[in-house]
Amino acid sequence: MAQILPIRFQEHLQLQNLGINPANIGFSTLTMESDKFICIREKVGEQAQVVIIDMNDPSNPIRRPISADSAIMNPASKVIALKAGKTLQIFNIEMKSKMKAHTMTDDVTFWKWISLNTVALVTDNAVYHWSMEGESQPVKMFDRHSSLAGCQIINYRTDAKQKWLLLTGISAQQNRVVGAMQLYSVDRKVSQPIEGHAASFAQFKMEGNAEESTLFCFAVRGQAGGKLHIIEVGTPPTGNQPFPKKAVDVFFPPEAQNDFPVAMQISEKHDVVFLITKYGYIHLYDLETGTCIYMNRISGETIFVTAPHEATAGIIGVNRKGQVLSVCVEEENIIPYITNVLQNPDLALRMAVRNNLAGAEELFARKFNALFAQGNYSEAAKVAANAPKGILRTPDTIRRFQSVPAQPGQTSPLLQYFGILLDQGQLNKYESLELCRPVLQQGRKQLLEKWLKEDKLECSEELGDLVKSVDPTLALSVYLRANVPNKVIQCFAETGQVQKIVLYAKKVGYTPDWIFLLRNVMRISPDQGQQFAQMLVQDEEPLADITQIVDVFMEYNLIQQCTAFLLDALKNNRPSEGPLQTRLLEMNLMHAPQVADAILGNQMFTHYDRAHIAQLCEKAGLLQRALEHFTDLYDIKRAVVHTHLLNPEWLVNYFGSLSVEDSLECLRAMLSANIRQNLQICVQVASKYHEQLSTQSLIELFESFKSFEGLFYFLGSIVNFSQDPDVHFKYIQAACKTGQIKEVERICRESNCYDPERVKNFLKEAKLTDQLPLIIVCDRFDFVHDLVLYLYRNNLQKYIEIYVQKVNPSRLPVVIGGLLDVDCSEDVIKNLILVVRGQFSTDELVAEVEKRNRLKLLLPWLEARIHEGCEEPATHNALAKIYIDSNNNPERFLRENPYYDSRVVGKYCEKRDPHLACVAYERGQCDLELINVCNENSLFKSLSRYLVRRKDPELWGSVLLESNPYRRPLIDQVVQTALSETQDPEEVSVTVKAFMTADLPNELIELLEKIVLDNSVFSEHRNLQNLLILTAIKADRTRVMEYINRLDNYDAPDIANIAISNELFEEAFAIFRKFDVNTSAVQVLIEHIGNLDRAYEFAERCNEPAVWSQLAKAQLQKGMVKEAIDSYIKADDPSSYMEVVQAANTSGNWEELVKYLQMARKKARESYVETELIFALAKTNRLAELEEFINGPNNAHIQQVGDRCYDEKMYDAAKLLYNNVSNFGRLASTLVHLGEYQAAVDGARKANSTRTWKEVCFACVDGKEFRLAQMCGLHIVVHADELEELINYYQDRGYFEELITMLEAALGLERAHMGMFTELAILYSKFKPQKMREHLELFWSRVNIPKVLRAAEQAHLWAELVFLYDKYEEYDNAIITMMNHPTDAWKEGQFKDIITKVANVELYYRAIQFYLEFKPLLLNDLLMVLSPRLDHTRAVNYFSKVKQLPLVKPYLRSVQNHNNKSVNESLNNLFITEEDYQALRTSIDAYDNFDNISLAQRLEKHELIEFRRIAAYLFKGNNRWKQSVELCKKDSLYKDAMQYASESKDTELAEELLQWFLQEEKRECFGACLFTCYDLLRPDVVLETAWRHNIMDFAMPYFIQVMKEYLTKVDKLDASESLRKEEEQATETQPIVYGQPQLMLTAGPSVAVPPQAPFGYGYTAPAYGQPQPGFGYSM
């Protein structure tokens, strides 16, 4: 049996199988912050990628194009932290958003997620914590200790509260890896350096401690060996015992001298420390004691990153091959392993208790029994309570404690046991029952309540039954927790909590007999019964039939409760509930009419029998409800006339339900019955329903009863909303007839619907005492003239005054007009005007009077108003008109009066006097009217002056339009008169702008010449001069030069630039020259005129540096480099040195460039200038000057110049320059080109650059300087990336020996790498195969085996190929190679060793064939090796086919223990062939897997008797007894025949054998057979047979034995019968006792119940009786 292992080892996935490049599986490119994600940085082609592998979905890796130095995934969510240089960013991959970013001042050398939202950042100097939340920046936690200087940081850990921080690093010292740690306390702000390689924090609660301790575990491999330390950090919490320090040795195998710890994780679930070393060993330690539990190697490659594995509470890691591995505690095995393998039962017990692990059952049971036997019951109780998985918490344990009597004054062992269990957690079902039974007997119910609240007891039906006898409410709690529905509902009912029954039944899906339950509740409390009934029907589907529920109510005559219930149950008003609605109303109309009235009033129901209910309502005196339900008009008319018995408001609403004809009939009946009593109701009905009944019908109804009062009130209620003219007119009529004059006034004033003409005529005819209604109508509808005539002719003049004074003063003008029309006296009119005093429109009054040519009538009144200070324009307008008509100095009035309306008066004057119209319009700025008057009357001078003074651009724009036929005479007047007269600059400015806006350049020039050139006030005005020149540029270019020369006060630069933009280059040049702006002048010559000769002459004439600079720049652009450089020198201007240098480089003017750069260096010591000067000196071959320059102080980029010289093959100059800057790499390259190889090697050594070494090396190879080339090559080959190029360079030129010599020399280098060993092996395979084997045996572990494999195969080095396949674990290929090339490659030991490791089992059979062909004598040895994995059936079939079974007999014997049919049959055949019957019998006895019958049939014909005996034996084994016995009889095997007959248990067969013995006269055999087949033979048959053959003597022993057995049986039967009779006699003597107390059913009620009806609360009630199937124990 294989040894049990305490760990479970699992490979989760292989990263290479997911497409991850093996080169990217390493500490610097792969991170794993938790067991959720693995993050790898890869480069695919030229694109950098980050690959994220979700461990829950590893087959779908996420690839993102991200270029970063490092990437770490959040431990729980798809959030990634990226680092590029000093920039840190946090991204949410799912949201595709950046969460946070920060730029560090120092490089981050290591970082790690220490929690779900915090990243730790480690720089060379300090450690920071950076929170993912909010906007916070990284917070510095502590400075790094000097002991970690120069270390590679490999981990950073914190404790759970982040109060202790640990930084871990490693470094190489004295040929070993030394670990350094810095432990930092956040609270104390102090650090402690510690030597250690791997560490972790853990929270551990010691036995007896109230709080957890913070433990710090670290492992170290020092010079003295390995140690694991476990200590408590900080001060222990109050009340805690300090954790004792632990320091245990860590074992490292002798072959792992350089091994050291690399990772540590602590399982919180199992309190186990997982320690992993660099060589792939796993160590498990108990956290509490430090004991080593297990150690083994789990990986041949280094596991470089680990994390806790949450699913198994173990550790997960990745090794350099890309395997993702996990190790965890095997919970089923670890305790047995510690007990049996480690022989540490104390540790096994401790871990089993502490971590609740199985496997220590026997230990616990043994310890418990021992303590119990010693009488140490308290300790035994602790052991039983603490045993893992509750293995000792059994009824047997409780019975044992119960059997121990309590000592006086001490707690009983049972209670001690229960006390410990209660402290630890919940009791199970049996424990709860056994604890509660004595507690309840002692009356300590409060303890039970306390335990239930603390959830210490497992509730069950039995416990509820136990508690119910004491407290039903508490029992209810138990039943609820135990989920016993029938008992719960029973308790709810008994405790009066009926409101909970339905809710609970629904919750648990239990359905009791609801009606029966309701009856029982109703007996106890009708109110609770009502509440319960409502709960039964509150859902969409009632739990019980409502009719049955109502019957229950009615059984107890509970009308009120039944009503309440039905009101709630029928609230949805369903059609199916009609009979119930009728029943509800009927019971209330008969017993409680008011309640029925209220129900009907709420209109809850609509599906009851309305006719039946109507009759009942009328009988109950509910006339209103009866009307609601009547449908016959006769019934309605009979009831509706009794309005004193009806609610008026309701009655009005009731009419809304009647048809139009029925309503009118009812109204007529009501008025006929009692008009005085019913008039008001009729009016209300008419008012509300007039639209439906038609207003005309209602008017006719009231008029038919001559009820003007009713008509007035009816129409009064609708007149305010009606649009019917007839309604309004009838209302006015009714109001007049009822004397409601005020209402007549109101309706005449407010209504807009009546016919005014009809009303006016009616009011005239009505001859009312008060004429105000007529006045209102005439005023509103413009009948004022008729009104005045009517009143004046009827001598009602006082109403005229009332009208204009009180009703509408604004109508005075019309009234005055009317009075004038009836020739009323002027004095009356004047007095009337004076009385009203301005509450009317003066304009209208003037218009009325003016129409009748009586305007002067108003002069006194107007003057009086003006004298009073009236500013009303209408008054002044009227007065102006009178003055104009009377020619009373009108112009003065028009100029001085500020109140009249200019437009009105101007319009009045246009035909009378245009000049006065202009005055009026000008005063009011009536622009358009004034322009029209001036244009029509040719007043252009006045218009031009007005426009200049007006200063309105829009107005100017309107008159200067081209479409204006009067534009030209107007412009002439503006130029000649208006502008000449003005002195206001603004007027001039607006006028000029208007001409510009109107695009009149020629007219503008004419205007400006008048202003500027004619010595006016504005001659020296700068803007006007500018404008004149600009306008000339635009309109008449021939005048521009004249204006430039004549004018002096203009903006020269601006004008010049405008001239340039208009291509007037000569004019621009003239302006610049006139004002001495020489730089601009020469720029015009260069850029616009394009004449460099004129520019050169102009520059010589003015001789200004700026001018020379401009010219030089132009010459440079034209390619005149020499002339440009001369001009720059004359300008003493080095500013354009870059352009000059570029131009000189292009044209090759190096001598001139030297002069220019020497001038420029004097002005500005620019680095570029000095750099170019050096290059120019080199180009002119002035090496002495160059050397002198570079040896002096300078700012030149000498390296850059050297590279340029090198590129242009100026190697002498380059040599000087590289030597000056000590660039030995480039110096070496230069020396190579100069042929100085030794000096080049010395330079390369100083440069120590791979590129330089390569260049010099290749040059030396080309120069056949192989010694120097090898010196260079040894510095190249250590770089794996460069090796291939170097090898190809040698090989392409055929220098194989030199290349091999160089690589052999390189193997001893300290930095020798796999590529060197690999390439040398390949070279050996090609050119020196004899050295290949030795090289591989020495260095196979350091070569790239796949690459060398291909080379060896190509070179046909089969032995070496097999060796490599073996080392590379490609065993299949190794075997195939040996079989394909046995002469060179096959070795017996090696073949047998490798063949067991192959993956393809088919190779076994090829190997068998190979051995059979080439090594047949060794075939059995091979088969022994192959047998564990060989298909023996197939092998046997093969050997049978090739007829070589005897050859492999040893193999067949060795594998026969598998009981394989083919093997067994083959061996049996061999044994038969060899006539080895003993071996055959042994084989068939030991191995039964073969065709028994076939073998038996074959053997029964064999010539040897022993084989025939075996055939009989086989027939017997297959229940072919007769055949077997017959065969034995045939071969005289009497003993076998008797034995087989006995074993057959066949009486007939045994008797036949007896007969045969007698026939053959074998009497001794007959006697022997009687005893052999004793149990099968019938004594009578034997007696008869013996008597017949006269052999009684031979049968007598048999008969004696038979007689003995029969007598013994008879004696036993006799004794048994006697005993039975005695027992029956004793039973009959006992009296029969009646009246024995019968057991009550267990679920019967436990409280006293009064006598009940047969179906009360007795035993037959389903809710409280014996549990029904489906709800009790019978489930």
Curated annotation (Swiss-Prot):
Q: List locations, semicolon-separated.
A: Cytoplasmic vesicle membrane; Membrane, Coated pit; Melanosome; Cytoplasm, Cytoskeleton, Spindle
- Organism of derivation: Bos taurus (Bovine)
Chain spans, region WD40-like repeat 7 = 302-330
Name of protein = Clathrin heavy chain 1
* Chain positions covered by the region annotation Heavy chain arm: 524-1675
Q: Where is region (WD40-like repeat 4) located?
A: 150-195
Give all Phosphothreonine modified positions.
T105, T394
**What are the start and end residues of every segment in region (Globular terminal domain)?**
2-479
**Residue positions where N6-succinyllysine is found in the record:** K737, K1441
User: Which key words tag this protein in UniProt?
Assistant: Acetylation, Autophagy, Cell cycle, Cell division, Coated pit, Cytoplasm, Cytoplasmic vesicle, Cytoskeleton, Membrane, Mitosis, Phosphoprotein, Repeat
The record ties this protein, via InterPro entries, to: ARM-type_fold, CHCR, Clathrin_H-chain/VPS_repeat, Clathrin_H-chain_linker_core, Clathrin_H-chain_N, Clathrin_H-chain_propeller_rpt, Clathrin_heavy_chain, TPR-like_helical_dom_sf
Q: How does it assemble?
A: Clathrin triskelions, composed of 3 heavy chains and 3 light chains, are the basic subunits of the clathrin coat. In the presence of light chains, hub assembly is influenced by both the pH and the concentration of calcium. Interacts with HIP1. Interacts with DENND1A, DENND1B and DENND1C. Interacts with OCRL. Interacts with ERBB2. Interacts with FKBP6. Interacts with CKAP5 and TACC3 forming the TACC3/ch-TOG/clathrin complex located at spindle inter-microtubules bridges; the complex implicates clathrin triskelions; TACC3 and CLTC are proposed to form a composite microtubule interaction surface.
Give positions of region: WD40-like repeat 1.
24-67
CHCR repeats, residue ranges = 537-683, 686-828, 833-972, 979-1124, 1128-1269, 1274-1420, 1423-1566
